[in-house]
Design a protein with these regions (language model features):
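Canonical AAA+ ATPase core
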Residues: 6, 18-21, 27-30, 58-64, ...
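Short helix/loop segment immediately N-terminal to the Walker
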Residues: 66-69, 73, 112-115, 212
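Short glycine-rich substrate-engagement loop in P-loop NTPases that contacts/grips substrate
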Residues: 43-79
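Walker A/P-loop
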Residues: 2-43
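Basic, amphipathic alpha-helical bundle interface domains used for macromolecular binding and assembly
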Residues: 166-212
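Short hinge/gating elements
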Residues: 7-10, 82-83, 127-130, 149, ...
Length: 212
């Protein structure tokens, strides 16, 4: 759905980030290199500049004219991309969580004296088990995620199947699949599906069952 948010949680190495990247490549037709630009990797020392963007350096050095007398903001790819991934979200400091809260809650960001309404996006976040490097997520921040799905490790039979896979498939250009699929069109179709009051209650029940 438009502005859909989902958190994937589970053990280390369970494929949460890989799944998020593959889905982005499929639905937004992004290359391996471009999908990496859409990822914000959680870290306790993340600054506002690393999350949102920075002032135009060319303007600061006088090599480019100001925009109506003001310095322009060069927004990071994470901010402007249609597909966003926050990797290891529980490594974000409370400060970083507050910066991202307006993005998730209102679809807008602000840096320096400029703000921007973020284009429609889909956001996935990954959550690993607690350790010494993790930070507790605030309740308002967690509440901005519509769904939280557990990602379990493969069982023995699944590991055996994975081990037998043709290694040449690792070089597949995932972005070339589903070429006829347009994410915005799918979201519009979903938005216009009619449903009864009973169906809405059932959907809300399912969503409530998959929240942190």
């Amino acid at each position: 759905v438009e502005r859909g948010t989902m958190m994937l949680y589970g053990g280390h190495g369970g494929g949460k980030t890989t799944l998020s990247k593959y889905l982005g490549q499929l639905f937004c037709h992004l290359t391996k290199e471009k999908i990496e630009d859409c990822i914000l990797r959680g870290h306790p020392q993340l600054t506002e500049e690393k999350i949102l963007g920075s002032l135009d350096f060319a303007q600061m050095t006088g090599n480019k004219p100001l925009d109506n007398g003001k310095l322009s903001v060069v927004w990071n790819e994470f901010v402007t991309s249609r597909w966003k991934i926050i990797d290891e979200i529980n490594r974000l400091s409370p400060y970083a969580q507050n910066i991202l809260l307006s993005l998730l809650a209102e679809g807008s960001v602000k840096y320096h004296d400029q703000s921007m309404i973020v284009p429609a996006f889909t956001l996935f976040a990954t959550l690993n088990p607690k350790d010494n490097a993790n930070t507790e997520l605030s309740l308002p921040f967690k509440d901005r995620f519509a769904l939280a799905l557990p990602i379990t490790m493969p069982d023995y039979d699944s590991f055996s199947t994975i081990g037998k896979r043709d290694k040449s498939s690792y070089n597949d250009r995932i972005e070339e699949y589903l070429q006829d699929v347009n994410l915005e069109e799918l979201q519009e179709i979903v938005k216009n599906i009619p449903y009864t009051e009973e169906a809405e209650l059932f959907i809300n029940y399912i969503i409530a069952s998959y929240r942190l």
